[in-house]
Design a protein with these regions (language model features):
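Conserved GHKL (Bergerat-fold) ATPase module
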Residues: 2, 6-236
Length: 236
């Protein structure tokens, strides 16, 4: 901290001393480090540094670190979305070599992940070009696909490591997961490992688990499995 002197309008007034934080550039931000160097507290501190007005902790994070066939580093956070979804606030930030470029990442980050927060840093992303150009760029396609894969891998890991905790978080993350399932074929192909289907009695099943549970006693006249669903647990 530094001690500063505040000028007074009155010539004979006693100068007032105030303390202010030193403002310095972080020469080694969290996303440039290896995941093994960071603790959960480090990730949380970085999130608060990025979004000081966000008071709820993120649900979990995804660390990006690849240098071939493209260069990409970054940290993405799954926020607790609740019912207030605002795509124009606290967006993902794009950097190039630790220099902030923009928080307009349409065409770089898949649409279904635009609700996430954090930082991506890559010198391989062309700047000042249209979204259609970005989507056609070979490096950007690979980066977008890699981000999608990392999110899917993270979901698979979370549900395997702590199924109970994952189920508790499902309502907060399902809008992202379900949007990804209908918009990204590669994500849909992986989703059978982590997408959950809640039943009216409060249980959660993956698609494979649900199929195994009902296939022998919920079939039509042709022997095909029938899945019953409701949009209103109480009214139907």
């Amino acid at each position: 901290r530094q001690m500063c002197i505040r000028d007074s309008a009155a010539e004979d007034a006693k100068p007032e001393e105030i303390e202010v934080d030193n403002i310095i550039n972080n020469t080694q931000p969290a996303w440039t480090k290896s995941p093994s160097e960071l603790t959960d507290e480090d990730y949380l501190a970085f999130y608060r540094e990025l979004y000081p007005m966000q008071f709820e902790e993120p649900l979990f994070h995804i660390h990006l670190n690849v240098d071939y066939p493209f260069n990409l580093t970054g940290i993405l956070f799954f926020p607790k979305l609740g019912n207030n979804i605002n795509l124009d606030k606290d967006r993902i930030q794009l950097y190039q070599n630790q220099v902030f470029v923009t928080d307009e990442v349409n065409g770089i980050v898949p649409d279904f992940l635009m609700l996430l927060r954090g930082v991506i840093d890559s010198p391989d992303i062309p700047l000042n070009v249209s979204r259609s150009y970005l989507q056609a760029d070979g490096a950007v396609k690979k980066i977008s696909a890699h981000i999608t894969k990392k999110v899917a891998d993270k979901m698979s890991s979370l549900i395997t490591q702590n199924r109970e905790d994952y189920e508790k978080k499902w309502n907060d993350i399902k809008v992202v997961i379900e949007y990804g399932m209908i918009s990204e074929d590669k994500f849909f192909e992986k989703s059978d490992k982590f997408a959950l289907y809640p039943t009216v009695d409060g249980k959660y099943f993956t698609w494979t688990e649900l199929s195994d549970t009902i296939k022998d006693h919920q079939t039509n006249k042709d022997g095909n499995m029938v899945v019953l669903y409701t949009t209103d647990d109480n009214g139907q």
